[in-house]
A protein has these predicted regions:
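Active-site and donor-binding regions of nucleotide-sugar-utilizing enzymes
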Residues: 5, 12-22, 59-160, 165
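A conserved nucleotide-sugar
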Residues: 24, 222-237
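Conserved nucleotide-sugar phosphate-binding/catalytic loop shared by glycosyltransferases and other
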Residues: 24-68, 78
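A nucleotide-sugar donor-handling region in carbohydrate enzymes
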Residues: 32-37, 137-216
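Donor nucleotide-activated moiety binding/catalytic core segment of transferases
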Residues: 75-79, 83, 168, 172, ...
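A donor-sugar binding/catalytic signature common to diverse glycosyltransferases
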Residues: 92-94, 101, 141, 269-313
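Nucleotide-sugar donor-binding patch of glycosyltransferase catalytic domains
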Residues: 295-337
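C-terminal amphipathic helix plus adjacent low-complexity
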Residues: 331-365
């Protein structure tokens, strides 16, 4: 059996194309993936894979640096028990959030091999340390780019590095075949936006190392979109220190400017989100979706701040700081069109990763 750690809303976009091609597996859903405030992506996983999801609850209230550290400790204890109970052949972890590191530790210290997806990347903050620690603990590696694979090899010396691309590109490719998304399909609250007209998607998280600045930073981003004259779909941020301040800024700005057409929601199902992203005039914020999926979809991105600073990027990205001139950048960038870029893959990563994981389990790793 393969155990797949699902730790947050964005991770499911990358994991589902792999899960679609696995047979003997269990999804261990934990942290914010289980919580309504963050979109409860575990519920989507339960719909997609009935009987395959095991929930683990550990998240503490507060969204501060201290509660983040304590969350990791609580989750480590829980995952150690879960892995001891199900005794998987491999534990799969994704990327760089702190919750993934607890899964790697809980598995590795019980002599369960770890397969790490999306190692070797750089974002310019503490996530780099977590990502590299996951790679160091892992036996098998599935980086998303050639440069990332070189970094993983330099770090680990492993002969088990498989550069198949990012699985979320598979989902983006599939989403383009779907009919356009309407505001009624995504739920949430606010103005009944017409997604056939120009609009922005705002997806912005607190800067990892500046949680106390989250309110002012989000307010600057929102004011920029508003001053650019773009209706906006605002998706609530994920579970990070400073998240409550980011959410407060959304409430303050939208209430202060009722004339601005906005719609807010906690989350959108992964494939539906990617179809919606393909319809947007621009993605604004600091989500890795702008770096990965938006590059494949050819969607312009105004990437704000330092959260994604070190990422490999295609030509659709315009990097800016938090300042009063954001609106001018958004006006210009939102009018641009870009070709599809295959930097993070061409849409076949999921089936290839699943095949390799299945092969490894059959060999007894």
């Amino acid at each position: 059996m393969i155990a797949v750690a699902l730790t947050a809303r964005p991770s499911y976009t990358k994991l589902k194309p792999i899960l679609d091609h696995l047979e003997d597996f269990v999804i261990v859903s934990c942290a914010s993936a289980n919580l309504v405030d963050y979109g409860e992506v575990a519920l989507q996983a339960e719909r997609d894979f009935p009987g395959k999801v095991r929930r683990v609850y550990s998240t503490l209230a507060g969204n501060t640096l201290q509660t983040t550290a304590k969350d990791a400790g609580v989750l480590l204890q829980s995952l150690a028990d879960v892995f001891a109970d199900i005794d998987p052949a491999i534990v799969v972890v994704m990327a760089d959030r702190y919750e993934t590191l607890t899964a790697s530790i809980a598995a590795r210290y019980q002599n369960i091999p770890v397969a790490h997806i999306q190692g070797g990347e750089r974002s310019g903050n503490v996530d780099d340390v977590v990502r590299d620690a996951n790679s160091a603990l892992a036996a098998y590696h599935f980086p998303a780019t050639h440069l990332a694979s070189l970094r993983v090899h330099s770090l680990t010396g492993s002969q088990h590095i498989y550069n198949y691309g990012c699985p979320s590109i598979d989902l983006a490719k599939q989403a383009l075949l779907d009919p356009p998304v309407t505001v009624q399909e995504i739920g949430g609250a606010g103005a009944p936006l017409d997604f056939n007209q120009r609009f922005a998607i705002v997806l912005h998280h607190p800067e990892t190392e500046q949680p106390n600045e989250a309110f002012n930073q989000m307010r600057t981003v929102l004011d920029g979109v508003r001053q650019a004259g773009l209706p906006a779909l605002i998706i609530w941020p994920g579970q990070d220190a400073g998240r409550d301040l980011t959410a407060k800024a959304v409430r303050v700005v939208t209430q202060k400017h009722p004339e601005w057409s906005t719609h807010t929601c906690r989350g959108v199902a992964p494939r539906r989100f990617l179809r919606l992203l393909s319809q947007a005039s621009v993605l604004v914020g600091n989500s890795s979706a702008g770096i990965r999926e938006a590059s494949y979809l050819g969607v312009p991105v105004v990437n704000v701040g330092a959260r994604q600073r070190g990422r490999e990027r295609a030509g659709n990205i315009c990097d800016v700081e938090y300042d009063d001139y954001l609106w001018m950048v958004m006006v210009d960038v939102s009018k641009l069109k870009f070709p599809s870029a295959a930097l993070y893959g061409s849409g076949d990563a999921g089936i290839r990763i699943a095949a390799k994981l299945t092969e490894l389990t059959r060999k007894g790793v």
